[in-house]
Amino acid sequence: MGKTDLSYTLADIAFRIGAELRGDGSVEVKGLATLQKAQAGQISFLANKNYLKHLKDTCASAVIIPSSFADQCSTNVLVMENSYFGYALCSQLFSPQWWSMSGISPSAAISESAKLGAGVTIGANVVIEEDAEIGEGAVIGPGCYIGAGSIIGAKTQLRPNVTVYHGVNIGARALIHSGAVIGSDGFGFAPNKGDWAKIAQLGGVVIGDDVEIGANTTIDRGALDDTVIETGAKLDNQIQIAHNVKVGAYTVIAACVGVSGSSSIGKHCMIGGGVGIAGHLEITDQVQITGMTLVTHNIKEPGVYSSGTAVEPNASWRKNVARFRQLDQLARRVRVLEQGGRRKSDAD
């Protein structure tokens, strides 16, 4: 990240992120950068020893670093054992406010029965329907839609063009990025003589405190019960959460994941990009699922789970696909050989 108009002394940064300062606390810092590209007036960090080779040549005014590497740094250091966490906290200090608007835009269409908390910011062309509630200090970006009876918690931020359908409850300090749709109909249809009858989706969506939802992610409302995203969960861009899904507290889900209806993901899970989770499954707490995995059964034990075939040269892949098609035949041949071996052993 380059320089901003924000500025802090190293002593101030150390206090704010809980680091031990070794060096000149009066040095002024105006931005963040990598070890390779940092200049005077910027702060950097070392969280991966593979980048240790860049430490001695960095021009950064300070480095957030674990104690085991602090002596190898020739500039000021902010010592934190979890230096990546320190970097995260420091990045928040230099993140500029994304909105320039203040108060309530005259172009916003707000129902007379809606309730607005103190200090809310509502951008241009926002629509807030009847009986919706916007919590204290919340920020609703331009072009957002808040459906009837929905609740937006205190200090929650909706970036421009977020759609929140009716009957959605979003907790405090959430951050929802542009294009996200919360509370759209779940995919429910009943077959009848070659036709499909729509199942009205009568549930809602409940989102806890401190949740982040990425751009163009969709979270469907429940069919009868609510779809639930618990406190502290983080969802990347372009994720599909189907009706009646539950995502446990502090679980993180990377981009392009699809979670089918009525599945439950536990707490503190990590779901890699492109994962597909079939419906009506239960995944316990502390599970990691690597990218592009297809989950078709319950996961009852914590751990790391994977499926799929890694990339290889096309010619090799084609040969292996041909062999894969012969697996059933090969299995039968092995079975015959094993049975023949047993008969011969019995005869001996």
From Swiss-Prot:
The UniProt family comment states: Belongs to the transferase hexapeptide repeat family. LpxD subfamily.
The name on file for this protein is UDP-3-O-acylglucosamine N-acyltransferase
Give the UniProt keywords, A-Z: Acyltransferase, Lipid A biosynthesis, Lipid biosynthesis, Lipid metabolism, Repeat, Transferase
**Species in which this protein is naturally found:** Hahella chejuensis (strain KCTC 2396)
Q: In which pathway does it act?
A: Bacterial outer membrane biogenesis; LPS lipid A biosynthesis
| PROSITE patterns noted in UniProt | HEXAPEP_TRANSFERASES (PS00101)
**The encoding gene:** lpxD
Q: How does it assemble?
A: Homotrimer.
Pfam families, A to Z? Hexapep (PF00132), LpxD (PF04613)
- Top-level division of the source organism's lineage: Bacteria
Q: Name one GO molecular function term.
A: N-acyltransferase activity
Give GO BP annotations, semicolon-separated.
Answer: lipid A biosynthetic process
Gene Ontology CC terms, in alphabetical order: membrane
The secretion signal range is: none
Q: What does this protein do?
A: Catalyzes the N-acylation of UDP-3-O-acylglucosamine using 3-hydroxyacyl-ACP as the acyl donor. Is involved in the biosynthesis of lipid A, a phosphorylated glycolipid that anchors the lipopolysaccharide to the outer membrane of the cell.
Catalytic activity, as annotated = a UDP-3-O-[(3R)-3-hydroxyacyl]-alpha-D-glucosamine + a (3R)-hydroxyacyl-[ACP] = a UDP-2-N,3-O-bis[(3R)-3-hydroxyacyl]-alpha-D-glucosamine + holo-[ACP] + H(+)
Note whether DNA-binding occurs among the keywords.
no
Active site feature: H243 (proton acceptor)
Q: What is its EC number?
A: 2.3.1.191
